[in-house]
Amino acid sequence: MTSFHTRRVEDRDSLIDFQSMLPPDIKIIAPTTYTRLNLLNYCQFLELFMQLRASGCRCEHGEILESKIRAVRQVISKIVETDTVFNGVKKN
């Protein structure tokens, strides 16, 4: 796959077309970009759950981690939303 930065905008399939930093095996579980983003979101949620379950009380660090996860979810949501609009305009 050609690097995202070296291709013209017209040649890119979508705004979320990027060179994968994941191992090739992950494509079996998550073949599309959207499923990879969902997998990332799920893994972050699982990590938080495991940390909170292990600790006896809620701490400031847990709240900071939760806020970071919320921020990542918002970014993922905006990427998908922008890509959807971009593809809609591209088709029309």
Swiss-Prot record:
It comes from the Viruses. It is found in: Host nucleus. Keywords: Host nucleus, Viral genome packaging, Viral release from host cell. Transmembrane segments: none annotated. Its main location: host cell. Belongs to the herpesviridae TRM2 protein family. Associates with TRM1 and TRM3 to form the tripartite terminase complex. Component of the molecular motor that translocates viral genomic DNA in empty capsid during DNA packaging. Forms a tripartite terminase complex together with TRM1 and TRM3 in the host cytoplasm. Once the complex reaches the host nucleus, it interacts with the capsid portal vertex. This portal forms a ring in which genomic DNA is translocated into the capsid. This is Tripartite terminase subunit 2. It comes from Equine herpesvirus 2 (strain 86/87). The gene is TRM2.
